[in-house]
Amino acid sequence: MLRLKCASQRYDWGKVGVNSIVYKLQVASENPDISHVDLPYAELWMGTHPSGSSCLWDNPHVTLAAHIQENPASLGKPSLIYFGRRLPFLFKVLSVAKALSIQAHPDKKMAVRLHAEQPDLYKDGSHKPEMAIALTDFEALLGFRPLNQILAFIQAFPELAELTTLELPSPEEKRDVQPPSIKQLYSNLMRSSPEKVESTIKSLLNRFTTGSKSVCDPPLSILGVDLQEEDVQALVDLFLRLTQAFPGDVGCLSIFFLNYIRLKSGEAIFLKANTPHAYLSGDCVECMANSDNVVRAGLTPKFKDVERLLEMLDYTPLTDSLRLGATQPIPTPEGISMKSFIPPVSEFAVDVIQFDAESRGFSLPSVPTASILLFLHGQGTITCPSTGEACSQETKFGPGFVYFVPADMIVNLVSKEDRKGSLHAFRAYVNRK
């Protein structure tokens, strides 16, 4: 078992300094690379991706990727057979102050094609399904709304009709016409000229801020859509925030096409390949296939690959529960909980371990593949009963400590008796047995 020194990413959408959980974890773990308190700290990366590879704490010149190449058995047989001599997931902590781009991650077939055609933009040929577990109140856009909701918004906000080139019947008309597809409507929106987009945004801003019109005309209730008034008002508030941060950006209008979801701490979402999404605010733990491929089309000053995004998106509306449920893999003593978030992919799964303030110890069951163990809160020591000795020279844990745990290793967590508060840890591992 090896302690890791992990990289931070300072994207401009991240929270700044002490407001960022990424910064606070790095400082608490005594990472010597963290010195600038006035910079954004957006992401903590734990894994082997070359854009931010972890290295060994006691020997920072050795990357985790190099260690795995020298010690492939540490990955475990199921992982070696399925993925070879590499760690197939990337584990992260995100601290979001400003909305990330409207984006999607390609499936394997598209990823190979993108990497072959534009390797400078798309760095690898891997797909990138991902999962986010909220640490604080967390906002996101995720997948397309049902078509009837999208059509209702277009009818309630006629300003959108011109961009989608949808000819709307009056409420008195009854026409037996085939409704347009989500792909047709969203493609028309995203291909609109910047001038038309800016004009539509200004018109909606006028509608939402002057009070001269009702917010929805006609009201959504007349249109037979199951959306509450508070849901519409939340969207209006989001629109006002986004237009301040990204004036004139077509992504501001995507909120009427995509599901707006607000997570509480401990709730999770799963994003399969080709699903449009954007993280808007809050803190989360994220796990994904080991790729950094992103196709963007809105809410960003970066390159927008609109045609590519429209080609690859999955336009199937997400009408089931948008949250990923958790299971409890083993019984736990009173005051201790362990939940597992198991997505429908092989690259990763995540356990969440929590002690209350009175609990002292817990034996974390082994998994047959390598794992990365992150401590968010709590202090104590780690021992490995398989050897009867300490796991390594450095066996303490505290906030921000990260460990690489070889396959099949049982880990005993012993909390410090005089610690303040509870223990909160996350374990990511390969979802193969």
Swiss-Prot record:
Entry cofactors: Zn(2+)
Catalytic residue list: 296
Keyword Membrane (UniProt): no
A GO biological process held by the record: carbohydrate metabolic process
Record-listed Zn(2+) binding positions: 103, 105, 130, 277
Pathway, per record: Nucleotide-sugar biosynthesis; GDP-alpha-D-mannose biosynthesis; alpha-D-mannose 1-phosphate from D-fructose 6-phosphate: step 1/2
Cofactor comment text: Binds 1 zinc ion per subunit.
Record keywords, A-Z: Cytoplasm, Isomerase, Metal-binding, Zinc
Record's catalysed reaction(s): D-mannose 6-phosphate = D-fructose 6-phosphate
Entry EC no(s): 5.3.1.8
Compartmental location: Cytoplasm
Disulfide linkage: none
InterPro entries documented for this protein: Man6P_Isoase-1, Mannose-6-P_Isomerase, Pmannose_isomerase-type1_CS, PMI_typeI_cat, PMI_typeI_hel, RmlC-like_jellyroll, RmlC_Cupin_sf
Role description: Involved in the synthesis of the GDP-mannose and dolichol-phosphate-mannose required for a number of critical mannosyl transfer reactions.
Name of this protein: Probable mannose-6-phosphate isomerase
Gene that produces this protein: PMIH
